[in-house]
Amino acid sequence: MSQPAKVLLLYAHPESQDSVANWVLLKPATQLSNVTVHDLYAHYPDFFIDIPREQALLREHEVIVFQHPLYTYSCPALLKEWLDRVLSRGFASGPGGNQLAGKYWRSVITTGEPESAYRYDALNRYPMSDVLRPFELAAGMCRMHWLSPIIIYWARRQSAQELASHARAYGDWLANPLSPGGC
């Protein structure tokens, strides 16, 4: 029996203590031996990112998960800084930048609005697939495989049972992320 893929879960939430949904989602990940949970705001409250350390973490894992709330149609500021600095030319892209080629990228997003708000004719004017396009493009730039995102809409309004169900499904996927049908 083969070992499950090593997963690096990059968690980015500037107000993590107030996010019930994200804590519930993280709990199963913390109990899995193949998952490294890396809380960016806990490690870099001053935004001074240790780029060589982060790049080493990326090299050591096959699946990279970006878990964060949707902030202004993007990600929290520290994760944006992390993406710009760590996924540098020569490491992740451009000449010689093949360190992440063949790895897997999955975004796990919580939102403050219902799924119905993400349509061309709705409040946000665009579907979530369009909103997340920059992340998909970044994965492509790094020659990574883009896995369909996991999105928890209206996270604050999810019942405890709904959040527990999402967390179980997420934990099951994290335990064996590259199994047939698991992507």
Swiss-Prot record:
Q: What the protein does?
A: Regulatory subunit of a potassium efflux system that confers protection against electrophiles. Required for full activity of KefB.
- Family annotation (Gene3D superfamilies): 3.40.50.360
Q: What is this protein called?
A: Glutathione-regulated potassium-efflux system ancillary protein KefG
What is the annotated localization of this protein?
Cell inner membrane
The UniProt entry, under InterPro entries, shows: Flavodoxin_fold, Flavoprotein-like_sf, K_H_efflux_KefG, KefG/KefF
Recall the GO molecular function terms of this protein's record: electron transfer activity; FMN binding; NADH:ubiquinone reductase (non-electrogenic) activity; NADPH dehydrogenase (quinone) activity
**Organism annotation:** Escherichia coli O6:K15:H31 (strain 536 / UPEC)
Which terms under GO biological process does the entry name? positive regulation of potassium ion transmembrane transport; potassium ion transport
> What is this entry's stated membrane topology?
Peripheral membrane protein
Q: Which cysteine-cysteine pairs are annotated as disulfide bonds in the entry?
A: none
Give the keywords, sorted: Cell inner membrane, Cell membrane, Membrane, NAD, Oxidoreductase
What Pfam families does this protein map onto?
A: Flavodoxin_2
Q: How does it assemble?
A: Interacts with KefB.
**Family stated for the protein in its record:** Belongs to the NAD(P)H dehydrogenase (quinone) family. KefG subfamily.
Q: Which GO terms describe its cellular component?
A: plasma membrane
Q: Chief localization class?
A: membrane
Q: Does the keyword Nucleotide-binding apply?
A: no
